[in-house]
Regions:
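Acidic-histidine catalytic/liganding microenvironments
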Residues: 57, 109, 265
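Crotonase-fold acyl-CoA enzyme core
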Residues: 104-216
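Conserved CoA-thioester-binding segment of acyl-CoA-metabolizing enzymes
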Residues: 1-68, 104
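Glycine- (often His-adjacent) and acidic-residue-rich active-site loop
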Residues: 48, 59, 67-102, 121, ...
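Terminal peptide-recognition signature
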Residues: 28, 32, 47, 65, ...
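Charged catalytic carboxylate motif
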Residues: 42-46, 98, 105, 203, ...
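Amphipathic alpha-helical segments at domain termini/boundaries
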Residues: 12-31, 179-211, 220-230, 258, ...
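Helix-loop "lid/cap" segments that line or gate small-molecule binding pockets
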Residues: 173-174, 225, 229-230, 244-250
């Protein structure tokens, strides 16, 4: 797409890098290492634009979110927060709405997402991780929801963090502001895997290879059904929806090819 090519140029050497590898894997890289990848309104706006472009792009198997520098993200830039504290309530509502838009677009992105964490992930950085489908962290990573330390709370990221770690863990982490390591992050389901930093690339390749083998439309449908029915009562409407989804996939070109390829003991053509 033209917009994709323009974004690659426009965002190169900016605070967010946007690249496509092997024509199937997209990489979004936080690139503000001098500020420990803390994000402000400029980064949030860039992420919204990038996520919108990805949503409307074709033939993507995996979207990876990572960072340059020592740390994944220090969360919201406090200079930005200080500037916003001098703005009106209406201006702060508009600003917060932009952040919630970005988080929602990341969480609801139709393609699978992989967060790769090195170093510190604080505040909003934890929110970004919580919005991704898979989280892979280096063993030396540290995490914190430290907003209460500066008289704030993790409000906009709260739905996604609570969804990831559960209400009881969130109550502790939101109110204490304590730091915790990658082992605790895995125990509470904030991250799925821990690896030595030198082994991260091997694990990334593992996930890329797996997603490349899967039916692309099936992957999109699999993610969507989780978002569609999570926390809903298992009533007739949910049951009917699941029947409709599997019926459509069984009779789709991709579904027929996948089953046929399996029975013929060959790789599917997709």
């Amino acid at each position: 797409m033209v917009l994709t090519r323009l974004l690659r140029v426009a965002r190169f050497m900016s605070k967010v890098l946007y690249t496509r590898h092997d024509n199937e894997v997209v990489k979004i890289t936080l690139n503000n290492p001098s500020r420990n990848n803390a994000f402000d309104d400029e980064i949030i706006s860039s992420l919204i634009t990038i996520l919108e472009d990805i949503e409307h792009s074709d033939n993507i198997k995996l979207v990876m979110l990572n960072s340059n520098g020592k740390h994944f993200s220090a969360g919201a830039d406090l200079n930005w927060m200080k500037r916003m504290s001098n703005c009106s309530h209406e201006e702060n509502l508009k600003d917060a709405s932009m952040l919630t838009t970005m988080l929602q677009k990341l969480n609801n992105l139709k393609y699978p997402t992989l967060a790769v964490i090195k170093g510190a992930a604080f505040g909003g950085g934890v929110g970004l991780i919580s919005c991704c489908d898979i989280a892979l962290a280096s063993e030396n990573s540290i995490f914190s929801l430290s907003e209460v330390k500066v008289g704030l709370i993790p409000a906009t990221i709260s739905p996604y963090v609570i969804n990831a770690v559960g209400a009881r863990n969130a109550r502790r982490l939101f109110t204490s502001g304590e730091r915790f390591d990658s082992n605790i992050a895995k125990q509470i389901n904030l991250v799925h895997e821990i690896a030595k930093e030198e082994d991260l690339e091997k694990r990334i390749s593992y996930f890329i290879n797996h997603f490349k083998q899967n039916g692309p439309q099936a992957v999109i449908a699999a993610k969507k059904i989780v978002l569609d029915i999570f926390n809903k009562e298992i009533d007739n409407s949910v049951i009917s929806h699941t029947c409709e989804v599997i019926s459509a996939l069984r009779t789709s070109k991709e579904g027929r090819e996948g089953v046929t390829a399996f029975l013929e003991k060959r790789n599917p053509n997709w």
